């Protein structure tokens, strides 16, 4: 009593405390960062190494394996995968959530250093690492185009200046430049001219390397002066290399220009990038795992004007893709939904109270509770994201409940004629324990979420804490500010009486009367009602087992990613044509705003595309509908496939794949893996539950196998090293020298003229100078034949791996796909030497599926313990928890009706329903127990009276929660696919629960009361001797 009086009789202090909470919340709101979702990125580091010209198998065995053995010893590595292709190896290290990425980076560098002595000596540079996940979609893509500058010059500008500057911006993890390569001097050799002049390829390489050196020359000085010695030992341009003497034939000088075409070109001519229909250089910017995407994008945009000033007028710099607009639009939609929810909740209160003064009280309590929560969010290091704002939207119905319960009870005393301050004191004292029970038991629901580990726990933590803080502030407001405002604003007596005799009040009285009559009938037929309770329990279990499930709702972020996979023997020229064809088809779609893409590099038969869709208000289709439409058009392109997927805010794992979900095959027997992977992929592609099935196993590339005749080589004076050097010099784009410039270093690249590499006959023109100085054709000591070879070699851990990727067809869920894959693997009879498991998002889904039931049961158990402690009873908590099955049935039926799978968002809704629907039972049980203790009523009379007396606050709180969630169901626009499952679950559960628990709770209360009396009688009987 003294606690309530302290605030009721000191209105100024109470108002100032509430104002302080509000001001702190406003300050916290202004300081909170903005993000699409809570920070759930795994720390990921990518290690890259190159050895130009080396086959994928050579890269895997000589580069990837030594690095993997060293990197695998690092503590906290969750998963290590690698992919080796032509001349390139990339290793992805995914660390545990609690691992600091900077400390992990230091360990990675130490491991690279330790493995350095085991790596091939011919590597042009040491392995490097980046603190970025290559499988993440770029947060921004910039393009450089020009009608004046060459692609190599644009690439040089992008790589040397723009990428370096952008990489220094806070939050940027990696800037990947694509579409070409650095400028270089290319030496395209003429094999016939070399043979005629008697010059070997190795002699040309040596001559070029010796002619371009950078060494210190020292200085001269006398007693008064000092002169730095400088020579013309460096060659900078193709024109400088052209007259270089590489050999003497019969006393005549053979110059480089006599046996080769020397040009200013690029390091790797097998690269192409495009934006819409124009050649372009792409800067793909990815954020650090722990960085905020909005802040990072804003920082980049703030630097763009400065970067524009450094760009020559003939170069056009454009933003081709930006992830932030749809994120901002989604958050604006949630904020609008929050405002609408607050307005609807206050409208519900007004309809019940029909008094402006009375409505003002919860109208003040709700914003104070919600705004005050922002301060706690800031202190906890949270962000304004879709989940935290949805938590506040749902909290609207919660926080008003406490104020309603207190206000309604005080109003009841005022209508009985009690003075306002006395009514405020008496009313708040009567329901203080009820409000405390409701709030504590609601917060208890979220304790298991706070203890949940892994990605789901990280994802739900902000939601749970935000909602719990809002409920806690609401509890404080309802026991302090609300009674004070009731005591000073409301009046007693007749002014409140007519509210029950007009309009909605008359309707409510009529409904309450009908409820009383029907409740009498239900109490007389309690066995039938008991069967209904048991039926809802069984139905809720069956619905949960049968409903389709997925990890997270498929988002429409307005951005698509596409992976091109062509025939494994395709040439770069043909692949570039495929890229152009695909981009033309996509550009013609009415929903597409911008398309960029690139191909080439170490994977000649693959490419990537990034598609920006028009804003939601300018297109009628969702991202998935656009994909379905494009899929039909793209299927007609022969020799290549383009796999499209919508970019999601959550993507787990570091594997780059052409689809959203992955299933990985592992084996220590590479031949078994290569035998079974095609069979498994074919079986999965036939499943209707899967779409866009593809694999990263590419072991059918065209290869030319050369077999040396070692005896002949020995007789002719030719070593294997001589022969290998010949092939590397001729076909490996060998980097033979370095050109040093003020801002960067460039390479001299040597290979035979492309005109001689169009078919296998080029090998007939190759020759080696033997130890006697005679040219020996390759065909004299080697034979060759076509064969198949892998285009890439993949590892997970230290085992050979192949990842099958897939998307979900429209109307299918991840649970259906997972079950179909498991059935297919069983039917195929895959041997134990080949192990299959889900990876990435699909793996997290499997783990979440196993934890969902435990999580729900843990929440129920926690609520039972809290209620048992509060009521000092084992029985009454069971009565209160009997409301849950009907809510579960309503929620799951609503998801089925709206064709929405059960996702992590729907799980949040179920957890919320556990907290919401028990409030009705708490209000009934509290008043029934009070009536039994102080009113000398029988249990039947007590529960009947409690149901009638609490009917109005029960209806008010339920409708407030329902209307608070209704905007989530009805909302459209950006991000609605996240909001709708939560709203559908809550509204469906509330409707079903309200229809049933008003009748089932009294019956369950009486059942447990009779059970309690029966046990007490048995325990009180004397034991016979």
Swiss-Prot record:
Pfam families: ACR_tran
Top-rank lineage group of the source organism: Bacteria
Transmembrane parts of this sequence: 15-35, 333-353, 360-380, 387-407, 431-451, 469-489, 528-548, 851-871, 875-895, 897-917, 953-973, 984-1004
Gene3D superfamilies in alphabetical order: Multidrug efflux transporter AcrB pore domain, Multidrug efflux transporter AcrB pore domain like, Multidrug efflux transporter AcrB TolC docking domain, DN and DC subdomains, Multidrug efflux transporter AcrB transmembrane domain
Keyword match ATP-binding: no
GO CC annotation terms, alphabetical: plasma membrane
Localization in the cell: Cell inner membrane
Keywords carried by this UniProt record: Cell inner membrane, Cell membrane, Membrane, Transmembrane, Transmembrane helix, Transport
Major place of residence: membrane
Annotated membrane topology: Multi-pass membrane protein
GO molecular function list: xenobiotic transmembrane transporter activity
UniProt family annotation: Belongs to the resistance-nodulation-cell division (RND) (TC 2.A.6) family. MdtC subfamily.
HAMAP family attached to this UniProt entry: MdtC
Assembly notes: Part of a tripartite efflux system composed of MdtA, MdtB and MdtC. MdtC forms a heteromultimer with MdtB.
Protein's recorded name: Multidrug resistance protein MdtC
